[in-house]
UniProtKB/Swiss-Prot annotation:
This is Medium/long-chain-fatty-acid--[acyl-carrier-protein] ligase MbtM. Its EC number is 6.2.1.20, 6.2.1.47. Gene3D superfamilies: 3.30.300.30, N-terminal domain of ligase-like. It catalyses: a long-chain fatty acid + holo-[ACP] + ATP = a long-chain fatty acyl-[ACP] + AMP + diphosphate; a medium-chain fatty acid + holo-[ACP] + ATP = a medium-chain fatty acyl-[ACP] + AMP + diphosphate. The keyword ATP-binding applies. CDD domains: FAAL. SUPFAM superfamilies: Acetyl-CoA synthetase-like. The lineage of its organism: Bacteria, Bacillati, Actinomycetota, Actinomycetes, Mycobacteriales. Activates lipidic moieties required for mycobactin biosynthesis. Converts medium- to long-chain aliphatic fatty acids into acyl adenylate, which is further transferred on to the phosphopantetheine arm of the carrier protein MbtL. Keywords: ATP-binding, Ligase, Nucleotide-binding. One of its GO terms (biological process) is fatty acid biosynthetic process. One of its GO terms (cellular component) is plasma membrane. It comes from the Bacteria.
Length: 521
């Protein structure tokens, strides 16, 4: 894997373009490679076998990714502090996390570096900027690669976060599969603000590097501060490739009618992954962006997971958003569920649907079950747990089914809501609830409470910033009852930012469920 990246970067005539201190700065991939070798030399000198990166995506920070791989060490990228967090406590927690996964060297920069160095931890912590610019007396000779290339944290949205151990062969197979499916060439330009500690952000960066494309990389904090800047970045870069979670497309689509003066005519690949795809919101994004030249065939709803290095399925290039509609019966009539088709397995991967113990539904001829995967991109196992057997099927915990055009993912098995014997996927309720004025986009959780609760059934918790809670609550109940065929037993409005999330921004539905059950006992 290291040699493949080195060859791609040294032979590329394109650039890495980084948003740094408010301005875009160009760095040829060959320069990034040179800085990566400087960092690799330091890792080799320290004989570090596991390296952690923490910080904003500067050119040196990004160079440390291939640099770690060049040194044959295992890479783990950890998130910085969330807004409003205590910096000292974050630093202590981060160093404890480093110790738990066997880290031997930490690279960071700026205030993050200062905070990490102020902890009592004994793990060496280096300035990635200084190391990237260090002069070497001799050329770097890469050692043999280690057993693992990446230690990727899982989201932990339905349980305790774990660490997936990914071999160099698995990561490279996934990257090559993506390059083939997307047909990345040096003529392409990628644009991303995804966090590099998330598997989707890391894979997007590395696929562009491996494919010889130009990449414009912005910090996630820059998107969070000004989401519509994403459109400006794609316009400035003449981006052909981008990727984002569903909430970003939903946000842009919701307020798209207010926007002017963008050019998305070059965009041919806009991947939607990392969370359930809201077909209505994704379509609205395409409709609103059409006047800026967006071709709807660029929409790419995909499926992946950290345990499979990143991607599992991707639709055929240019097919756009394809949906499957399922008619569901309830006591109040028949309702239609709409799910995105997330395509076929990438090269080297296989997917099957395994029967479940009553957690799926047999509707309209679809065989619902748990999605299981295996293949060349699959992890070796979780850190601290027994390794996976070679060639074994890995149960993802996701429910879905197949149609002629590919896989359909319905939701997490642990998050399935059962009301009066009927199974409901949280995403369909959350999509409807988010349409109520004052309810924050991407800040709604639907859960089911058990029979021991005072008000068992469907409970909706939503961050609310409107002025008329009673009217909004009434509208929400009516909308959900009309469109989903179930009446919520309770609706709870919360302050913005109150819902618990993972480090990658995913809502922790099971934590909300426990809180709602505790309150209602």
């Amino acid at each position: 894997m290291a040699s493949a990246l080195a060859d791609a970067m040294t032979s590329s005539g394109r650039d890495l373009v980084v948003l740094d201190h408010g301005g875009w700065r160009r760095h040829p991939w060959a320069e990034v490679h040179q800085r990566a070798e400087n960092i690799a030399a330091r890792i080799t000198e320290d004989a570090a076998t596991v390296v952690v990166l923490v910080g904003e995506p500067t050119v040196e920070f990004i160079a440390a990714i291939p640099g770690t791989l060049y040194a044959g060490a295992a890479l783990s990228i950890l998130p910085g502090p969330v807004r409003g967090a205590d910096l000292g406590q974050w630093a202590r927690n981060t160093m404890q996390r480093c110790a738990s996964i066997g880290v031997r060297l930490v690279f960071s920069h700026g205030e993050h570096l200062d905070a990490l160095r102020a902890t009592p931890a004994s793990i060496p912590t280096c300035d990635v900027t200084e190391t990237g610019h260090a002069r070497r007396d001799s050329s770097f000779t890469p050692p043999d690669h280690g057993e693992f290339a990446v230690l990727q944290g899982t989201a932990g949205s339905t349980g305790i976060p774990r660490t997936a151990q990914l071999s160099p062969e698995a990561v490279l197979a996934n990257l090559r599969g993506l390059v083939a499916c997307i047909d990345i060439t040096p003529a392409d330009t990628g644009c991303s603000w995804l966090p590099l500690y998330h598997d989707m952000g890391l894979a997007f960066l590395l696929t562009n590097a491996l494919g010889g494309a130009e990449l414009w990389q912005a910090p996630t904090t820059a998107f969070s501060a000004s989401p519509f800047s994403w459109l400006q970045w794609m316009t400035e870069s003449t981006a052909t490739l981008t990727a984002a979670p569903n909430m970003a497309y939903g946000l842009i689509g919701k307020y798209g009618s207010r926007l002017t003066d963008f050019d998305l005519g070059a965009l041919r690949f806009a991947l939607n992954g990392g969370e359930p795809v809201d077909c209505q919101g994704y379509r609205r994004f395409a409709t609103e962006m059409a006047r800026f030249g967006l071709d709807p065939s660029a929409l790419v709803p995909a499926y992946g997971l950290a345990e499979s290095s990143c991607a599992v399925t991707v639709p055929i290039l240019g097919s756009g958003l394809q949906v499957d509609e399922v008619q569901v019966s309830s006591d109040d009539g028949r309702f239609i569920r709409t799910h995105a088709v997330v395509g076929e397995p990438i090269p080297g991967m296989q997917v099957r649907i395994a029967p479940t113990d009553g957690s799926g539904e047999q509707v309209d001829g679809r065989d619902f079950g748990e999605i299981e995967v295996r293949g060349t991109s699959l992890m070796s196992g979780y850190l601290g747990e027994p390794p996976l057997e070679a060639g074994s099927w890995f149960p993802t915990g996701d429910l879905g089914y197949f149609v002629d055009s590919g896989l359909v993912v319905c939701g997490r098995a642990k998050e399935l809501i059962t009301v009066a014997g009927r199974n409901i996927f949280p995403a369909e309720v959350e999509r409807v609830a988010a349409q109520v004025q004052g309810v924050r986009e991407g800040a709604v959780v639907a859960v089911g409470t058990d029979e021991s609760a005072v008000r068992p059934g469907l409970v909706i918790a939503a961050e609310f910033r409107g002025t008329d809670e009673p009217a909004a609550r009434t509208e929400l109940v009516q909308r959900v009852a009309s469109e989903c065929g179930v009446v919520p037993s309770n609706v709870v409005f919360l302050e913005p930012g109150a819902l618990p999330r993972t480090s990658s921004g995913k809502l922790r539905r099971l934590e909300v469920k426990r809180s709602m059950e505790d309150v209602n006992r």
